[in-house]
């Protein structure tokens, strides 16, 4: 199923109930080094809880919200431009902020090569965040 058809089906199901739908599209969600440094806590964890507080009400008020995840979600060795890699906490806060779907197909998808693509897919699945665009295998 293509991204467009998935989105179309989602919007159609919303319309069946009320006759209208409010959509939010956002991007690019990425991590530059200064953002990583700001979110890093002394114990090595990352706290992004405040990152979307100003726009969270708008995201959550939408019937369906989509954001382009412009960074792989990796393991230790997080980095900003030019080879992005963000911790799982960043993906989690996107879901917590109200985004219903993350788009993963973009020019930074392979910043951490095949392993990063597979890890991103697994992390998003484990967090229960819907995502579309890249897959761990061609099948």
Predicted regions and their residues:
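Acidic, metal/ion-coordinating pockets
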Residues: 4, 11-139
